[in-house]
């Protein structure tokens, strides 16, 4: 029930456009936004940071002037992003957008899955408590083995290489002194209340490899090293973005641990591995997801949006 004088404006249609790095999501999203008179919510764990423009392949200022983008330039480099933050920003965008359609565009599919399935609220911690917990976790020789010892049920659900989820589980343990599985029982997930139509780009392997090579070369030509150098001087070395592809290799170059040629090769290789993981995730982790080429997805989204609008 809406209280008198309090109206939440939400887009009538939420459409997610997913796809691996280098698949052409950004270019297609701009085209679609223009044709559908839509706005764009950026679901990207790097574009959310200020001052990371080249490494994140962030939309240009001209593109952003013509089409409203949300969740760009929101965090400083030394702040952390997570699924809960993206959910909050998405709900904020839904409230303020006056358009019929909001396109959710990005490669951070794990965050979208977490939002759709629902998030359990994390314990509220002060900055001092966060630092203390981070130190505790850093002293563990094998975080996964420790998690297994305190909460076998939770450890069973997490792959030993899934450092993100292991870390989150241990944060809960140190913050609450409760096994994470018990904490989640007491704080159940709340599924997302709004329907999101899911589409994902699937690009042929050789074409994707060529896109990634061209993109990497372009990033280096546009000043990637200079961009990361400015951040490396200014911010703590353990800041979350310094672990991202394109950034971490540039740091190794700045530390003279890679040559320029090795830097380019490392970014290409790591991006291709990431793209493979993203593709697999999109294929296996979503129900009712439509996958196809750029042309197929463009046609499917336009048809889906326009028929839906006519029905209303």
From Swiss-Prot:
**Positions with a binding annotation for ATP:** 19-26
> Does the keyword section mention Ion transport?
no
Site, Interaction with substrate tRNA: residue positions: 108
An annotated GO BP: tRNA modification
Q: Which Pfam families match?
A: IPPT (PF01715)
Question: InterPro entries this protein is in?
Answer: Dimethylallyltransferase, IPT, P-loop_NTPase
Q: Where does substrate bind?
A: 21-26
> What EC number(s) would the UniProt record show?
2.5.1.75
Q: What class of enzyme is it?
A: transferase
A molecular function (GO) term: ATP binding
Q: Please indicate which superkingdom the organism of origin belongs to.
A: Bacteria
Q: Where is this region: Interaction with substrate tRNA?
A: 44-47
Q: Which reactions fall under this protein's catalytic activity?
A: adenosine(37) in tRNA + dimethylallyl diphosphate = N(6)-dimethylallyladenosine(37) in tRNA + diphosphate
What are the entry keywords? Answer: ATP-binding, Magnesium, Nucleotide-binding, Transferase, tRNA processing
Q: Which cofactor does it need?
A: Mg(2+)
The task this protein performs is described as: Catalyzes the transfer of a dimethylallyl group onto the adenine at position 37 in tRNAs that read codons beginning with uridine, leading to the formation of N6-(dimethylallyl)adenosine (i(6)A).
Under HAMAP family, the record lists: IPP_trans
| Subunit (UniProt) | Monomer.
Q: Which family does it belong to?
A: Belongs to the IPP transferase family.
Task: Name the chain's protein.
Answer: tRNA dimethylallyltransferase
Species this protein is from:
Helicobacter pylori (strain J99 / ATCC 700824)
Tell me what gene encodes this: miaA
């Amino acid at each position: 029930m809406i209280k008198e004088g309090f109206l939440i404006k939400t887009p009538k249609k939420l459409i997610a456009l997913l796809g691996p790095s280098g698949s052409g999501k950004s270019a297609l999203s701009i085209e679609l936004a223009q044709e559908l008179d839509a706005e764009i919510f950026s679901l990207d764990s790097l574009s959310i940071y200020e001052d990371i423009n080249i490494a994140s392949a962030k939309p240009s200022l001209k593109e952003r002037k013509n089409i409203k983008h949300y969740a760009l330039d929101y965090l400083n480099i030394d702040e952390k992003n997570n699924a809960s933050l993206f959910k909050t920003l998405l709900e904020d965008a839904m409230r303020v957008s006056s358009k019929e359609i909001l396109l959710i565009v990005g490669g951070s599919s794990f965050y979208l899955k977490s939002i759709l399935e629902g998030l359990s609220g994390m314990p509220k911690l002060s900055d001092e408590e966060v630092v203390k917990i981070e130190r505790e976790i850093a002293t563990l020789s094998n975080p996964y083995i420790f998690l297994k010892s305190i909460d076998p049920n939770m450890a069973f659900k997490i792959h030993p290489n899934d450092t993100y989820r292991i870390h989150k589980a241990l944060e809960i343990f140190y913050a609450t002194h409760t096994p994470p599985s018990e904490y989640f029982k007491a704080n159940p997930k709340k599924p997302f209340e709004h329907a999101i139509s899911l589409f994902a780009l699937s690009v042929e392997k050789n074409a994707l490899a060529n896109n990634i090579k061209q993109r990497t070369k372009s990033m280096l030509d546009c000043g990637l090293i200079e961009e990361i150098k400015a951040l490396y001087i200014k911010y703590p070395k353990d800041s979350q973005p310094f672990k991202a592809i394109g950034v971490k290799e540039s740091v190794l170059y700045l530390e003279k641990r890679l040559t320029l040629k090795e830097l380019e090769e490392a970014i290409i290789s790591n991006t291709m591995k990431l793209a493979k993981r993203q593709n697999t995730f999109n294929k296996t982790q979503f129900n009712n997801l439509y996958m196809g080429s750029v042309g197929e997805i463009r046609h499917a989204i336009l048809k889906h949006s326009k028929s839906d609008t006519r029905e209303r």
